[in-house]
UniProtKB/Swiss-Prot annotation:
Taxonomic lineage: Eukaryota, Metazoa, Chordata, Craniata, Vertebrata
The organism of origin for this protein: Mus musculus (Mouse)
Family annotation (Pfam families): ADAM_CR, Disintegrin, Pep_M12B_propep, Reprolysin
Disulfide bonding pattern of the chain: C321-C405, C361-C389, C362-C372, C476-C496, C654-C664, C658-C670, C672-C681
Domain EGF-like: from-to ranges: 650-682
Protein name stated in the entry: Disintegrin and metalloproteinase domain-containing protein 33
Cofactor list: Zn(2+)
Signal peptide: 1-29
Amino acid sequence: MGSRCGRPGGSPVLLLLPLLLPSCPLRSARMFPGNAHGELVTPHWILEGRLWLKVTLEEPILKPDSVLVALEAEGQDLLLELEKKHKLLAPGYTETHYRPDGHPVVLSPNHTDHCQYHGRVRGFRESWVVLSTCSGMSGLIVLSSKVSYYLQPRTPGDTKDFPTHEIFRMEQLFTWRGVQRDKNSQYKAGMASLPHVPQSRVRREARRSPRYLELYIVADHTLFLLQHQNLNHTRQRLLEVANCVDQILRTLDIQLVLTGLEVWTEQDLSRITQDANETLWAFLQWRRGVWARRPHDSTQLLTGRTFQGTTVGLAPVEGICRAESSGGVSTDHSELPIGTAATMAHEIGHSLGLHHDPEGCCVQADAEQGGCVMEAATGHPFPRVFSACSRRQLRTFFRKGGGPCLSNTSAPGLLVLPSRCGNGFLEAGEECDCGSGQKCPDPCCFAHNCSLRAGAQCAHGDCCARCLLKSAGTPCRPAATDCDLPEFCTGTSPYCPADVYLLDGSPCAEGRGYCLDGWCPTLEQQCQQLWGPGSKPAPEPCFQQMNSMGNSQGNCGQDHKGSFLPCAQRDALCGKLLCQGGEPNPLVPHIVTMDSTILLEGREVVCRGAFVLPDSHLDQLDLGLVEPGTGCGPRMVCQDRHCQNATSQELERCLTACHNGGVCNSNRNCHCAAGWAPPFCDKPGLGGSVDSGPAQSANRDAFPLAMLLSFLLPLLPGAGLAWCYYQLPTFCHRRGLCCRRDPLWNRDIPLGSVHPVEFGSIITGEPSPPPPWTSCQQRSHPPSLDLLSDPANSELT
C-alpha cells in the first residue's frame, strides 16, 4: 500500500491486509520430495573447550546458557557460538492445554528451561544463527547475505549410528521443493540466501529505550492434529516459530517476549473456517477473555487450516495494544518455521501500523535474498528483514501515540538472566553494551567488559545524554494525542518510564469522543481519514435511514455467515460510516465510493459511504464502519456496534480520588495538573503521576522560588509593622522627622505608615491617608519632604 494509507490522526484502521503466497504445495513430510538430499553431518557440542558429545535426536541432556557447536558444511569447519534466548520467555510464562471435559490445564514451567538459541558463526562478521536444539538441531545458519544453510535432523529410521543431521544450501532446499524462478511472476520465487541483520542496528537498539512485544500464541485444534496430537511437538513448533519471529522483529528494534502458549487440544474455542476474515474476528472476540485474565500486547493464532484463495495471514492495521483488535491469524503453511514466522511477523507488522511495501521500496534485500517482510506477495525464499519504508512508517506510528504498551517494560533487566557482553543488547549484570570492540565508538562504555567509563552514569536510553542521566522532570515522551499523557525522566534511570495514557472513557476532542486504548476516535476524524481534510460526518438522519436497511449501503456489520445486519435506531451512529465532502475518491486503495441520497426537510442530501471492491484480493473488514469508542450521543459511545453508556464507575471512582486536581491514567492512578502533586492531587506540587516520572515546569527554578515567596510574602507585613514599632521612632527623631503618639495603641507611628485597623483596605489597594503632622521643636528638613504626606504620591510596598 502507498503512504496515503497511513493514519495521521488517531485511532487504528481496522483494515485487514493479508499476506499472499503462490498457490503451490508448501506443506510436506519431513523429508523433501524425490531424491533430494543434503550433506550428511553430525554436529558436536563443545564444552569446556573440548569436543564433548555428538548431537543426537533425543531431548538434550544439557541446555546450557551458552555453548559452542562444531559441524562441517561443504568441506568447511563451522563453529557456532550459541546463546540461549533468555528474553524469549517472560517471567510468569504459562502453557495451557485442555482436558477432555474442556477444563483448562495451566502450567507454569521454568521460563529459562527451553532449547531455543541464537548466535553467530565464529570468523564470519555478518553471520547469525537461529537454532532449536530440541530433538536434534534445526534452524538457520547464515554466513553472509549470499551464503546460508538450513540444518535439520534426519528421520530416526535413516540415522542408524551416524550421521544424525542434514545440512542444505537454502537455494538447494527451495529448488528441490519444486518452486521455480519466474521473473515475470507477481510472486517472488528465487534461490534463497537470507540477508544478515545490519550491524548498525546493534548500536541503535542499545541507545534507545527498548520496546518489547509481549506475545501470546495459540495453536488451533487442526494444528494439534497435524502434529499427531503430540502436545510436546506442538509446543516445540510454536517455540521455534516464536524464536524466528523474534529475530525478524529485531530488525525493527523490537524484542519479542513470549508470555504464554495455548494449544486447543480438544476443540477450537473460536470459530475457524476457510474465511480468513470470519476466523480473525471470531478469534479477536475470544481473545478479549484471555487478555482480561493475562494482559499482553498481541495474541496470534496459528492454524492448521487453509484459507480461501492465497491468503495465509490476516491482521487489523494499527491494532496493537487495543483490546478489540490486537491480534492476528496465520496459517502454518510452511514446513520450515522461518516460513510461518515470516507470515506472523508480516501480520504483526500490520498491527504496528505498517502497510504493504510499494514497488521499489525494498532495497535492503532483493528477491534472491528473500525480499522484505511487508511486501504484499511473497514466496520462496522467505523474507527476513523489514524495509526502510516500514521503519519510517513505524516511527510515524510511534510519534502519533501508537503502540504505548510496547514501552511498558522500562528496565530491560526485568526480563533478563545470564548475558553475553558484546552482543549489543543491555542485559543483566551489564552497565552498557555497545557491541563488539571494533564497532564501539561509545565514549561512555568499555566494550571489553560492558562497564561504564569513569565519570559516566549511563550509556543508553532516552534519559541519558553525554554519559549523564538527564535531570528529573526532563520530558522524554510528549503526549501524542488527546488521550495520551507525557512522561518525564526520573533522574535515576536512563530509560523513559512506561507509556501511559488516559483511562478508557475519559472525554476527548472537546467532548465529541471518549478515549479508548489511548486513541480518541471521532466521526470527523474517520471521515477525513477516508476522504481527506474537507470531509465531515453526514447529518444524523443519513445514519438513521441508511443503517436501518441492513445492506451494503448501510448496516451494523455482518454475522458469521456474512449477511449484513440492520442497525437499531439507537445504534445507527455505530454502523456504516457516512460522510459528506472531501475528495471525490477514497484515499485508501481498493475502496470505492457508494453515495446514497435521502430527503431531508424537502431537499436531497447525499450520504457518502465506502465499499471494498470484491475482487481486490483484500479479504478485509468493511473499512467504512464506525470505529469502536466513537461517541454516539451525550455520554454514549459505540461498542460492539451498539451505542452504550460511556459512564464508567471505575473512571468516576478514580476521578474522585484525584480531588478534581487531575485526570486518571491507564494504570488507574491520578495524573495531576500543574500545581498539584501525585498520588492524589491534594497537595501543592509540579503535576504528573507516580507512573510518568516527576513533572517539571518550564523554568526548573521557578517552582522553588514561588514556594519560597509564598511562604515569605505573608510574613512581610507583620515584619514591617514590627520594624516600625521598634526602629522607626528613633529613626524619625534622629532624622528630624515629626512623629505622633497613637493614644489607642500607645506606640509611635511614623508618618505615612498604615494604621493596623486599615490593613485590610491596604491589601485590597485602597490607600489610607497619612496621619496629620504634629508640631516639633525642630524641623531641619526642607519642605520637599512634605510629599510623604501627599496621599496622591503615596506608594505601598
